[in-house]
Structure formats: C-alpha cells, structure tokens
C-alpha cells in the first residue's frame, strides 16, 4: 500500500512567531519524529508552506486576519528548523490560501494519506477536506497528536468536523 505524509504549515510564524501558540510549540518534536518515521518507511512526503507577500494586509485574508505572517522570504515563512533537512527530498508546495489546490495531484497514487501540522482548524481541515473530496477512495487520516489549532477548543471542533466527513482522526 502506497502511503503519504502531508505536513501542513510547520512554519516559524505559526510556532513561535506572529501567530505562534504554546500548543504549536508542543507538537514540533512529535511531527519531526513522524516525518523521520515516514521517510524511513519510504512514504511520499509533502510539505505545504503558507506563503504571503508584502501586500498581505490588502488581501481578503489580510482584511479578516490583520496579522502579517509567513511573508516570503522572511524567517517566519521558513519551516521549523527540525524539518528543514527532510524538505530537500520532499515535495514542497507554497500556497497563498488555506488549501493547497494542487495537493491531490501529488498524492493521487497513494491509498493512505496522513495529514499533520498547523493549524488544525484552518489549514489542516481545509487540506484534509480537499484530499477527501478529490480522492474519495483513499484513506485520509489526521494525526491529532501532531496537530494544533488556534485554540485547544477550535482544534477539538475541527477534529469532530473531519470525523463527520469520514476522515479518520488518530
């Protein structure tokens, strides 16, 4: 069975930068270990990077969330340091929106796809739902121990919403 691990937005700004949270910091080691295990198992590895530019505050998202973050090529835009060594041999998708619309084509040959990362209630749920919509016969899973939301409550609500849409929550 061909498997993939999708790592959503494990970027400095979401961990200890402008939108960082203690919960995001707390999952870094678990995500790094999950990535290491996936690489050792020969799984396909995909990273997404939330990618904005200097005009972010003038965008629709910037008007609703007026906090500059993940401005390419700032330090905050970069992947957390523990994951950088793994990115060189992975697929890395820059995305200007919550969902990486090109993501399904990169994992269409996989039967089991696990999603981890940040933020559970925004980009993780968006990409998990995108994958489920485009690849309805694939097993789409979200490892809740390797995700964090904007708040613990919104993290839990997002996991419940994904369960309702037949996404397996681990």
Locate predicted features.
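Short, conserved acidic/polar surface loops in the N-terminal third of protein domains
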Residues: 56-60, 103-105, 126
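A general structural motif
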Residues: 1-2, 42, 109-113, 137
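Internal catalytic-core helix/loop-beta-alpha segment
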Residues: 73-122
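A short glycine-rich beta-strand->turn/loop micro-motif centered on a GG-aromatic cluster
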Residues: 114-118, 137-150
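Conserved strand-to-helix beginnings and helix N-cap segments that scaffold or border functional pockets
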Residues: 104, 125-128, 152-156
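Histidine-anchored nucleotide/phosphate-binding helix
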Residues: 33-37, 125-135
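Active-site acidic carboxylates
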Residues: 1-92, 141, 150, 156-163, ...
């Amino acid at each position: 069975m061909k498997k993939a691990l999708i790592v959503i937005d494990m970027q400095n700004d979401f961990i200890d930068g402008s939108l960082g949270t203690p919960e995001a910091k707390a999952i870094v080691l678990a995500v790094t270990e999950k990535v290491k295990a996936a690489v050792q198992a020969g799984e396909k590895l995909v990273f997404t990077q939330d990618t904005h530019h200097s005009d972010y505050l003038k965008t629709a998202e910037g008007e609703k969330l007026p906090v500059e973050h993940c401005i390419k090529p700032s330090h905050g835009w970069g992947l957390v340091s523990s994951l950088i060594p793994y990115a060189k041999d992975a697929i890395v998708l820059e995305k200007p929106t919550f969902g990486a619309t090109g993501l399904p084509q990169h994992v269409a040959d996989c039967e089991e796809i696990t999603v981890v990362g940040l933020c559970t209630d925004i980009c993780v749920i968006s990409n998990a739902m995108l994958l489920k919509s485009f690849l309805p016969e694939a097993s789409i899973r979200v490892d809740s121990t390797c995700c964090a939301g904007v708040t613990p409550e919104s993290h839990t609500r997002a996991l419940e919403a994904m369960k309702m849409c037949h996404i397996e929550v681990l």
